[in-house]
Regions:
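A short catalytic or substrate-binding loop motif that flags glycine-/basic-rich loops and adjacent residues
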Residues: 1-4
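Polybasic, low-complexity RNA-engagement segments
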Residues: 15-171
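Conserved beta strand-loop-helix elements of the APE1-like EEP
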Residues: 7-15
Length: 171
């Protein structure tokens, strides 16, 4: 047998036209705590509710936004379905929503609420990328760090100090 010879088998399925049968994905329900924390977080953080046209679902302890018309992925290994929004941190008595890095990167300009805009040549940008805290006046809470208008990651402002939430593996 020569390298490259062999057989290929594929099962095709009709996706449009008459008599189409597509299974929809089954989503895991979102806990009441998670939904409450997500809504509180998004109201406090964004100027416009992101992913409002998508369905919320849980994969383990993580909250995802998935398009409603996603076909079933049963039998396929999907690295990630939808956008990871975040997870709950803290105790069961006092849970808090912790946003994911992928959420920051998926946000559109019109959805961004509180933000810290940095220029590409700003020394604060280098400090942020290295994991240091930044000084910035403003309202306490989560904010998106942006460079030239594009989201880079999260920070959490408390008493005019922005705590760095840039993922350690990317620093």
């Amino acid at each position: 047998q020569v390298l490259g010879e062999g057989h290929f088998v594929a099962k095709l399925q009709k996706t449009s036209g008459e008599n189409v049968m597509m299974k929809s994905a089954i989503f895991n329900p979102v806990s009441k705590d998670m939904e409450k924390q997500w809504l509180e977080f998004s109201r406090a953080t964004f100027s416009k509710q992101p992913f409002s046209d998508m369905q919320l679902t849980m994969f383990g302890e993580k909250l995802f936004a998935v398009p409603e018309n996603v076909p079933t992925l049963r039998g396929l290994k999907a690295l990630r379905t939808g956008v990871w929004l975040g997870s709950l941190q803290g105790s069961k008595q006092k849970p808090r929503f912790e946003p994911s890095h992928s959420l920051a990167l998926a946000l559109r300009q019109e959805e961004l609420g509180e933000r810290l805009e940095l220029s590409p040549n700003d020394e604060k940008l280098q400090r942020y990328m290295q994991g240091h805290e930044l000084e910035s006046e403003g309202q306490d809470g989560w904010l998106v760090i942006t460079v030239a208008g594009f989201p880079l990651g999260w920070g959490r402002r408390s008493k005019n100090i922005v705590k760095n939430a840039y993922p350690k593996g990317l620093r």
